[in-house]
Regions:
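Cytochrome P450
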Residues: 1-404
Length: 404
């Protein structure tokens, strides 16, 4: 008798689906690598090589109708919703500030911020690692790069959290969003604070991203706001998600934490990439089909939406040995957590730096931590980012002192 494969419930725009999607991901990769979602009327692509194939063929799979499912963002001017050559032209405006060499110049600043964070946390003996650790570092670093005043970092964090999480809470085709007012309020606050900064940078430019955009003669304020929000969300929220998840997962996998303590060089070689593959903070992105064609025997038509399932692709056994296990010694692979091709995450090198420095200092200063309540950490239901709302931890209060 042949094995009967259970067909899971798959709704690619249901936030609840992404709380624990891994059984469904396995089924999709094995049985329906190009899956038609009959509820949401779009395609899901789950295998690693297929995600890369879509990401690297912008002619056939366009970003110009928007990067989020069922939302027409063709009028938005952010680079994430553009195809080449327009996308590359806009990206090139700030790309020099995100090269590996440019990012390395920020390491001392990032370490100073991490030290400041841990100086506050370590004496407490317990904390919510999401609020006290994970959310602070990227909000401060990205806020500084953009040009927000340092005392505005909590606003930066709140804007990114609300926009990323609230906009992914409910299917756009489902009932009216119960959170519309909170999302609108966050956007109004972001606009009210940012527009005066843009006007100030036009009068007196500084060494920050707002100045780079504000002084472009062909850019209006709306375009500057679009790009600012993109960098703020991508830079603050995804790094927060990765750090928070890894604090939790290293508490549950002490053997992996011991490896990092015994071989700290792993954070320089393999561990950070494995963290990012394992967490895959961004759940999906959308592309729009520009011409009729077939993929794995399925007929895709012009205008169809395709959702790239990064978390499924990053656990594809066709690419990774034992992909369902966290292995900080894993040889570097081509994970797609940052996307791939032309739209590869602009801030990837900065995210890697922040994650590496955070865990170098965290493991040095408070090497032993445990979950305060193993049942507490909960994934926030979302169709965009897979993040924990809270990760309570406990740790000894006689830590290694900060670096002098």
């Amino acid at each position: 008798m042949s094995d009967v494969v259970a067909v899971p419930r798959v709704n690619l725009l249901d936030p609840a689906f992404y709380v624990d999607p891994f059984d469904a991901y396995r089924w999709l990769r094995d049985e329906a690598p190009v899956f038609w979602d009959p509820v949401q009327h779009l395609w899901g692509v789950s295998r690693h090589d297929d995600v890369i194939a879509v990401e690297t063929n912008g002619r056939r799979y366009s970003s110009a109708k928007g990067s989020r499912p069922h939302l027409d963002l063709s009028r938005e001017q952010s680079m994430i919703n553009l195809d080449d050559p327009d996308h590359q032209t806009q990206r090139n405006v700030v790309a020099p500030r995100f090269t590996p060499r440019a990012v390395r110049t920020h390491e001392e600043h990032v370490r100073d911020v991490v030290t400041e964070i841990l100086d506050r946390v370590v004496p407490l003996g317990e904390c919510d690692a999401v609020e006290a650790i994970a959310s602070r570092l990227p909000a401060i670093v990205v806020g500084d790069l953009l040009g927000y005043p340092r005392d505005a970092w909590e606003q930066v964090r709140d804007w990114s959290e609300k926009v990323m999480h609230l906009s992914g809470q409910t299917s756009p085709t489902g009932p009216p969003h119960v959170f519309d007012r909170a999302l609108l309020q966050a956007m109004e606050e972001f606009t009210a604070v940012t527009i005066p900064l843009v006007e100030d940078r036009r009068r007196a430019p500084r060494d920050d991203l707002l100045s780079v955009w504000a002084t472009r003669p062909d850019w209006d304020t709306a375009r500057v706001l679009d790009e600012t929000l993109l960098v703020l969300n991508g830079g603050a929220e995804t790094t927060r998600t990765a750090i928070g998840a890894m604090i939790r997962d290293l508490a549950l996998r002490p053997e992996q934490r011991r490896l990092l303590l015994e071989r700290p060089n792993l954070l320089q070689t393999s561990a950070v990439e494995e963290f990012i593959r394992w967490v895959s903070p961004v759940l999906n992105m959308r592309r729009t089909v520009t011409e009729d064609h077939e993929l794995h025997g399925e007929s895709l038509r012009e205008g169809d939406e395709v959702v790239l399932l990064y978390g499924a692709a990053n656990r594809d056994p066709r690419v990774y040995d034992d992909p369902e296990q966290l292995d900080v010694t894993r040889a570097h692979g081509r994970h797609v957590a940052f996307g791939f091709g032309a739209h590869f995450c602009l801030g990837a090198h900065l995210a890697r730096l922040e994650i590496r420095v955070m865990f170098e200092e965290l493991l040095r200063r408070m090497p032993e931590w445990e979950l305060a309540d193993p049942d507490e950490p909960r994934i926030v239901p979302s169709t965009f980012a897979r993040a924990y709302d809270r990760v309570g931890i406990r740790f000894p209060t006689d830590p290694t002192p900060a670096r002098s």
